[in-house]
């Protein structure tokens, strides 16, 4: 699917870089650019009785195997999704932009941390994760301005079921009129039928 419904010149240059194996919080005013702090998920530590006082590598591997099992049963979602100032160089190395208001021609950089994707076996001792991403650009009236299915695909192969995987997404919008828009990424897990959507409202200032 590909949409091009805007008469004015709209040059969309898309480049997404994922990395190295290693939603945007809703505002009171959808278009304001102000963000509420995201509530931190409450993490309950494992009961101390289940972890030896001095864990061995074998104990840690058993815990990691349990995490992998839970991970594969988790719906595909995003632990983090935000506009950032610069591309992340490592997993977790993001610099939150703190605003969704952009100058005309300024690129939109997004940092995404997917959770719940699967792994396909590769050979006898390796695993491959992979994600395919669609995008849509909508105006404040909900009309589609541009979009493309499967415009980017990423994969990584490792001897372990890697969970430190992130996406650097870059979108340059040239010739876009000042106003409010929504950038939508739909992420498909290549190892399953799981899908998740990330909506990032933003404003081009006049």
Task: Tell me what each language-model feature is.
Residues 29-206:
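Intrinsically disordered, low-complexity terminal regions enriched in Ser/Thr/Pro/Gly
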Residues 1-27:
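Sec-dependent N-terminal signal peptides
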């Amino acid at each position: 699917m590909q949409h091009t419904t805007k008469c004015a010149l709209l040059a969309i240059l898309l480049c997404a870089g994922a990395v190295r194996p290693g939603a945007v919080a809703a505002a009171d005013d959808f278009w304001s650019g102000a963000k509420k702090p995201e509530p931190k998920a409450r993490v309950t530590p494992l009961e101390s009785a289940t972890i030896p006082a001095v864990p061995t590598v074998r104990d840690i591997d058993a815990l990691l195997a349990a995490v992998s099992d839970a991970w594969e049963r988790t719906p595909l979602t995003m632990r983090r999704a935000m506009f950032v100032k610069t591309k992340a160089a490592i997993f977790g190395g993001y610099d939150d932009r703190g605003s969704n208001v952009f100058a005309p021609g300024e690129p939109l950089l997004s940092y995404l941390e997917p959770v719940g994707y699967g792994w396909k076996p590769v050979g006898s001792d390796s695993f491959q994760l992979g994600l395919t991403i669609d995008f849509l650009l909508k105006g404040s009236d909900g009309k589609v301005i541009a979009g493309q299915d499967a415009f980017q695909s990423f994969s990584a192969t490792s001897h372990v079921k890697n969970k430190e995987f992130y996406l650097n997404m870059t979108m340059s919008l040239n010739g876009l009129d000042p106003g409010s828009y929504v950038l939508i990424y739909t992420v498909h897990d290549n190892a399953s039928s799981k899908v998740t959507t990330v909506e990032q409202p933003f404003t081009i200032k006049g």
